[in-house]
């Protein structure tokens, strides 16, 4: 009999009673669940939590494609998304699927984080992002998903033909992903400092203190709809309380 697992079965219902509205429609609910899932694995004692965070630090700073994507998948899970790394030919590097109540979204990500001779985003990079968006539209749009496509990179410029063909594709700066993680790490640490595996009141208190610091559902889509080619940390984190 696993007491922590049994306790986890009831705590979500307790969170829904925190407010008078239906909390399951709120992004907050999904963050709480993701934070709880992680802390139930890592606990509040010892150094497992710090080691987990430090590993994610290294992955998101990595210049190696697969290592970065490993961290990016873990980050997506931690903020309430279902990250998917498709295996089929010409697959996107990573796709985040978010289902938050009646709101559904898909974001595809192409990671261009390794150094290239050009030192700039080239037309084929943008072409890949367009292809992944077209594939996501064909698969998910009729199911009611809002769909966006992006490229994550350390590069700060596009070749002229890449810029002219980019359309609605957004370029997310790699450092903004690290800044997003640093924000999440701070919130997660504050949450963990109050949270307890066995105390429902402590869980309730940690959830209550977290809620006003979070953005509303759809924050990532709104960031990607910002009228600029490059999505910097100021744009990506604009709805997160600093």
Identify the role of each PLM range.
Residues 1-2, 10, 146, 151:
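Compositionally biased, intrinsically disordered low-complexity regions
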Residues 2-63, 230-242:
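Interdomain/boundary linker segments immediately adjacent to catalytic/signaling cores
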Residues 48-223:
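Catalytic core segments in nucleotide and nucleic-acid processing enzymes
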Residues 211-242:
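Charge-rich interaction segments
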């Amino acid at each position: 009999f696993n007491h922590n697992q049994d306790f986890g079965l009831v705590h979500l219902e307790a969170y829904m009673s925190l407010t008078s509205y239906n909390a399951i429609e709120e992004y907050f609910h999904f963050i709480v669940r993701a934070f709880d899932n992680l802390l139930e694995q890592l606990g509040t004692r010892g150094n497992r939590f710090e080691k987990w965070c430090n590993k994610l630090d290294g992955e998101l700073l990595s210049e190696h494609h697969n290592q970065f994507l490993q961290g990016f998948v873990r980050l997506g899970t931690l903020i309430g998304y279902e990250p998917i790394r498709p295996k089929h030919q010409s697959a996107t590097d990573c796709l985040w699927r978010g289902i938050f109540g009646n709101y559904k979204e898909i974001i595809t990500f192409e990671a261009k984080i390794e150094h290239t001779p050009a030192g700039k985003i080239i037309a084929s990079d943008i072409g890949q992002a367009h292809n992944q968006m077209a594939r996501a539209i064909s698969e998910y749009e009729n199911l009611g998903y809002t769909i966006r496509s992006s490229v994550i990179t350390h590069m700060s410029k596009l070749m002229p033909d890449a810029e002219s063909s980019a359309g609605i594709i957004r370029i997310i700066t790699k450092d903004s992903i690290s800044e997003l993680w640093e924000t999440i790490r701070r919130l997660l640490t504050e949450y963990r400092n109050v949270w307890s595996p066995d105390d429902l009141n402590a869980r309730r208190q940690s959830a209550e203190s977290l809620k006003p610091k979070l953005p509303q559902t759809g924050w990532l889509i709104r960031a990607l709809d910002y009228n600029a080619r490059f999505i910097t940390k100021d744009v990506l984190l604009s709805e997160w309380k600093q």
